[in-house]
From Swiss-Prot:
Domain Cytochrome b5 heme-binding, chain residue ranges per copy: 36-84
EC number of the protein: 1.14.19.-
Amino-acid positions noted as binding heme in the UniProt annotation, renumbered to this chain: 52, 75
Motif Histidine box-3: positions: 373-377
Recorded name of the encoding gene: D8Des
Keyword Transmembrane attributed: yes
A GO MF term: oxidoreductase activity, acting on paired donors, with oxidation of a pair of donors resulting in the reduction of molecular oxygen to two molecules of water
UniProt keywords, alphabetically: Electron transport, Fatty acid biosynthesis, Fatty acid metabolism, Heme, Iron, Lipid biosynthesis, Lipid metabolism, Membrane, Metal-binding, Oxidoreductase, Transmembrane, Transmembrane helix, Transport
Alphabetical GO biological process terms: long-chain fatty acid biosynthetic process; unsaturated fatty acid biosynthetic process
PROSITE patterns per record: CYTOCHROME_B5_2
Protein name according to UniProt: Acyl-lipid 8-desaturase
Motif, Histidine box-2: chain positions: 213-218
Function: Fatty acid desaturase that introduces a cis double bond at the 8-position in 20-carbon polyunsaturated fatty acids incorporated in a glycerolipid that contain a Delta(8) double bond to yield (20:4(8,11,14,17)).
Amino acid sequence: MGRGGDSSGQAHPAAELAVPSDRAEVSNADSKALHIVLYGKRVDVTKFQRTHPGGSKVFRIFQDRDATEQFESYHSKRAIKMMEGMLKKSEDAPADTPLPSQSPMGKDFKAMIERHVAAGYYDPCPLDELFKLSLVLLPTFAGMYMLKAGVGSPLCGALMVSFGWYLDGWLAHDYLHHSVFKGSVARTVGWNNAAGYFLGFVQGYAVEWWRARHNTHHVCTNEDGSDPDIKTAPLLIYVRNKPSIAKRLNAFQRYQQYYYVPVMAILDLYWRLESIAYVAMRLPKMLPQALALVAHYAIVAWVFAGNYHLLPLVTVLRGFGTGITVFATHYGEDILDADQVRHMTLVEQTALTSRNISGGWLVNVLTGFISLQTEHHLFPMMPTGNLMTIQPEVRAFFKKHGLEYREGNLIECVRQNIRALAFEHLL
């Protein structure tokens, strides 16, 4: 399954970042010099603004900031080797530049990654991936067949489609992180991307829309002003025990801790509209993705003919399942400002901004392994089937370095989010 070639690193070369962003973000600011700090060197990345598959926004976020751990998280050893030439031409970072990657914790984290590589935890897991793929495609297409052919209960068919689309999102996420097919970069990047685009078509989301959001989220999780995933205003304002925020809530927002759970049901519809708008604003460049979306909705209209009344139920259930899971693992956690993060290792930032959903293997499968959010953010290129295996070592690592390993069952995680929204006790 794509074995051979460069399979020892966490990811793929710079030209094939796992989660590319939107090139349209590059504007007249192209001429501004951009420098990031890698391995203690101040590297000029200005010329990569238009060609960097991860987008130029990450360069601006990490301007004169240590990006070593983030760079290694999404690039292979081959790409790191390619960077050596630029490092030799680069000057040392200013003496006052924080270098968390060179701290004892940073070095310990790098050693842990190397142990995982040596143990084969980055190797592909074909049976796991086949199982997950079957959980997506079988209910989706079986449900569509039931609806179109009039076999069995239309409600049952609609529920199966909703369940398949729900799991489809998590599986597409894995492929687009390039954590499924491993081996020769030239082959497996294309295979992972092709699978991701196919799954995007099946569920009706544009891949480039997802990438534009997700790329930045991973490298600056819960960083105020940089992470697009935590921009939930005006619908939800996370107070997090701050009186200054509580006092600014309007009359509607003062009910947010009550409508938080129900509002998860509209997320699928919201994301679909956002995805369509994202593509529409980038035509004709994104014509292929626009045609894929048109084809998806044409097929849905054909399949659900005579049962259109079930479509709201499909999107409500899918949105609720996805939203309640995603929000449980990040949104109620710490929000960090850029100055704080400059001094943090990737592990420290992850410890403050991620929360796992406990419950074992079944919960992991039913949440697309996003329940292991901490491990996923530390090792985004690792096949999800191996995240449970390394969990005890990650716990021990956190304990060794005095970090809190945050987790709870789904109900506890939802309560954590509600507490972060509460405000009455601050007035």
